[in-house]
Amino acid sequence: ELHLKHQPRHIECFDNSNLQGTNAVAACVVFRDGKPSRKEYRHFNIKSVEGIDDFASMREIVHRRYSRLLEEGTPLPDLIIVDGGKGQLSSAYGVLKALGIADRVPIVGLAERLEEVFYPNDPLPYYLSRTGEPLKVICHIRDEAHRFGITFHRQKRSKNFIVSELDSIKGIGEK
């Protein structure tokens, strides 16, 4: 149903998370043969983006992830899913093109709410069968990326809150 040449056995999914532009992070989850491969999950602190810019954040993490895999000679996934619509997808796809791997790795965007699937260079969304297995699988993977990213974001936010509260106490905080 996803119009792929081969059934994907190795899938990676990306999700960004921030609170009004602060503590921007992203997550990459990896599924192999339909099961989470938690040891391969990755968190990313967004380094190059100030404020709220999901597209720039997506470009940064996709570039960091796949330039590293290429450098290490690590096999690329059979499918990349980005949490988001056309904008996030085209940001990620642009990076894959720049790295020279856009023709080697299929990529889709999955927009929440209507569960629309977007393909590069196609302005119209594709709707998978609501009861079909492909939609259930990619939604499960996307939701896992979201959960993993939100958990990391909360940890980072909580840690930053504690640090800043202690820093403001005279004699305890930074000198």
State what each model feature region is.
Residues 1-175:
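Acidic, glycine-enriched active-site microenvironments
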